[in-house]
Amino acid sequence: MNNRRFDCIGIVGHPRHPAALATHEILYHWLKARGYAVMVEQQIAHDLNLTDAITGSLADIGQKADLAVVVGGDGNMLGAARVLARYDIKVIGVNRGNLGFLTDLDPDNALQQLSDVLEGEYLSEQRFLLETHVRRTNQQSRISTAINEVVLHPGKVAHMIEFEVYIDDRFAFSQRSDGLIIATPTGSTAYSLSAGGPILTPTLDAIVLVPMFPHTLTARPLVISSSSTIRLKFSHITSDLEISCDSQIALPIQEGEEVLIRRSDFHLNLIHPKDYSYFNTLSTKLGWSKKLF
């Protein structure tokens, strides 16, 4: 493989359990011993008391590092990726979470796998993001991005909402439901999958719309081109209606506002070990049957 080598490595990711910080510390000293320039996310350096470390924010790491190693689960990866996607930096994950669809490296074998990656032995792909605008006429939009999905939902559990969906400015359907999931191929194995949506392979230029508990027997997931623009309109809005991006950022929707969702201009430069297989990951994470022969 004739891949780009790395000179400056960023270490990011906030583990749910303090014991997982040991992975960050081992990784830091391992990289330093091999002569790499290392930047550590500020809070991690503080938690580990790495007083001599070069520290920075996610944006600093995105600007100055060649590779970011995200230690944690998919939640950590999503939070970091929304920032790092704005920069020319490659990203790989060490799984210290549960499923780990986006974090490939096994913590017990991460250093060996990472050693190969640092030698240029890796697979590279781009994952697109969704950009969401909550807006009203003649006013500035509130904007956020998502790697996995954008979800329209009420604040109350099991509270039905009514809305219309327009695709490329053409009416597509109206719905009474608990909400709507708009997912990327990356997000098709997350919340969308739990709601009955299809799995989209990461190379597809597609977006899937998945109804949440629709008040009809005929509503089905809809797959559209990633170049399409989705517009959500409301006849009236309850006080707690929200748009959620990756279940981490919430944008309230107020009376007179509409929601616009489209493919972002940014993308995540995700890399994997050289033996990575998307379908093997699906089989392992979802417990699919083994090969018969």
UniProtKB/Swiss-Prot annotation:
NAD(+) binds at residues 74-75, 148-149, 159, 176, 178, 186, 189-194, 248. The record marks 176 as: Responsible for conferring strict specificity to NAD. GO terms for biological process: NAD metabolic process; NADP biosynthetic process. Its cofactor is a divalent metal cation. The active site is at residue 74. It catalyses: NAD(+) + ATP = ADP + NADP(+) + H(+). GO terms for cellular component: cytoplasm. Gene3D superfamilies: Probable inorganic polyphosphate/atp-NAD kinase, domain 1 (3.40.50.10330), Probable inorganic polyphosphate/atp-NAD kinase, domain 2 (2.60.200.30). Keywords: ATP-binding, Cytoplasm, Kinase, NAD, NADP, Nucleotide-binding, Transferase. The keyword Ubl conjugation does not apply. SUPFAM superfamilies: NAD kinase/diacylglycerol kinase-like. It comes from the Bacteria. It is found in: Cytoplasm. Involved in the regulation of the intracellular balance of NAD and NADP, and is a key enzyme in the biosynthesis of NADP. Catalyzes specifically the phosphorylation on 2'-hydroxyl of the adenosine moiety of NAD to yield NADP. Homodimer. This is NAD kinase. It comes from Yersinia pestis. The gene is nadK.
